[in-house]
């Protein structure tokens, strides 16, 4: 019994294999990822990419779906891109946010004297509005990690979360 997952390639996207690295090129940019796993064969056709295995082991059959999902996310990223919308919430002390190089600086959070900072990963674009932050990019994992870094930077410890609700929170994530 073989397990097979098929990912269709959208128009305007080219998919190539270089050894074990899958390269996806599209109108928004290029992505690459190492897709090697023992027992899994990757075949690139003219309109689709096939991930197959002959193994009966659960770990290998699960990995077929995982690699297919990675390929599908890469194809979506280079055609549409990913967008995370975040909301800035504060009650008493107004939070000031600005992008400084590769970090997002959060000033006056809960009236703190020193600013907090969140790392912006390469390959993402962060735009700051009055009470919103948008994170965009073509790599789903990098965009999600950057949004998580921003949310984690405003985490409040040792206080009641029902009272202290200040922070920057992810409100929606979507394809652009």
Curated annotation (Swiss-Prot):
Entry's Gene Ontology BP terms: cytoplasmic translation
Keyword Ribonucleoprotein attached: yes
GO cellular component: cytosolic large ribosomal subunit
Assigned keywords, A-Z: Ribonucleoprotein, Ribosomal protein, RNA-binding, rRNA-binding
Disulfide bonds: none
One protein family per Pfam: Ribosomal_L6
Keyword Ribosomal protein: yes
One term of GO molecular function: rRNA binding
Function: This protein binds to the 23S rRNA, and is important in its secondary structure. It is located near the subunit interface in the base of the L7/L12 stalk, and near the tRNA binding site of the peptidyltransferase center.
Quaternary structure, from the entry: Part of the 50S ribosomal subunit.
HAMAP family: Ribosomal_uL6_A (MF_01365_A)
Family: Belongs to the universal ribosomal protein uL6 family.
Protein name (Swiss-Prot/TrEMBL): Large ribosomal subunit protein uL6
Source species of the chain: Methanospirillum hungatei JF-1 (strain ATCC 27890 / DSM 864 / NBRC 100397 / JF-1)
Species classification: Archaea, Methanobacteriati, Methanobacteriota, Stenosarchaea group, Methanomicrobia
């Amino acid at each position: 019994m073989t397990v097979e997952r098929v990912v269709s390639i959208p128009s305007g996207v080219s998919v190539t294999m270089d050894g074990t690295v899958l390269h996806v090129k599209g109108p928004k940019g290029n992505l690459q990822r190492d897709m090697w796993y023992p027992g899994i064969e990757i075949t690139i056709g003219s309109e689709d990419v096939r991930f197959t295995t002959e193994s009966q082991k659960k770990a290998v059959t699960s990995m077929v779906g995982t690699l297919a999902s990675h390929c599908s996310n890469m194809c979506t990223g280079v055609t549409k891109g990913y967008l995370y919308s975040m909301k800035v919430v504060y009650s008493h002390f107004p939070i000031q946010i600005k992008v400084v190089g590769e970090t997002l600086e959060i000033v006056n959070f809960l009236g703190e004297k020193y600013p907090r900072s969140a790392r912006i990963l390469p390959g993402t674009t962060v735009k700051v509005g009055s009470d919103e932050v948008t994170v965009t990019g073509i790599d789903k994992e990098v965009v999600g990690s950057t949004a998580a870094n921003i949310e984690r930077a405003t985490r409040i410890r040792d206080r009641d979360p029902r009272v202290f609700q200040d922070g920057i929170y992810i409100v929606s994530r979507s394809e652009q």
